[in-house]
A protein has these predicted regions:
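Intrinsic-disorder/low-complexity detector
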Residues: 1-52
Length: 52
């Protein structure tokens, strides 16, 4: 899986209600880190919109 795919998967997972601990990728892999980065980006986007 490409890093970008994992990022998008994590981003979408946040909006689907997944917890960061639901990351399906093996720890200490690029996909795991990318998925988590996507999840965290979505959460930041969610909170940033809540402030406005």
């Amino acid at each position: 899986m490409a890093d970008n795919d994992a990022f998008e998967e994590g981003y979408d997972a946040y909006w689907d209600g997944a917890d960061v601990s639901d990351n399906p990728h093996e720890e200490d892999t690029d996909d795991h880190r990318s998925w988590e980065a996507g999840w965290r980006a979505a959460r930041k986007h969610d909170y940033d919109e809540s402030d406005g």
